[in-house]
Curated annotation (Swiss-Prot):
Pfam families hit by this protein: Ribosomal_L31
Assembly: Part of the 50S ribosomal subunit.
GO biological process annotation, one example: translation
Protein name: Large ribosomal subunit protein bL31
Species assigned in the record: Xanthobacter autotrophicus (strain ATCC BAA-1158 / Py2)
GO cellular component: ribonucleoprotein complex; ribosome
PROSITE patterns given in the database record: RIBOSOMAL_L31 (PS01143)
Molecular function in Gene Ontology: rRNA binding; structural constituent of ribosome
The family this protein is said to belong to: Belongs to the bacterial ribosomal protein bL31 family. Type A subfamily.
Chain's role: Binds the 23S rRNA.
Source species, domain of life: Bacteria
InterPro entries: Ribosomal_bL28/bL31-like_sf (IPR034704), Ribosomal_bL31 (IPR002150), Ribosomal_bL31_A (IPR027491), Ribosomal_bL31_sf (IPR042105)
Amino acid sequence: MKSDIHPDYHFIKVVMTDGSEYTTRSTYGKEGDTLQLDIDPRTHPAWTGGTQQLMDRGGRVSRFKSKFGALLKG
């Protein structure tokens, strides 16, 4: 097996949208980094039945609604 071809696999802290935290192993960042989630299984519409509003990241949802709003109302 070749050496030094795999990414560094280390512990990071993951912070969920509700503030709860857990530690996991990942190739993200470097040892001890924190990954702040903007959406997680507790808030994602696919797992919550779609009852929560989508976050407007970068105005994408607003642009979509202004472009296709007439079709959505029908």
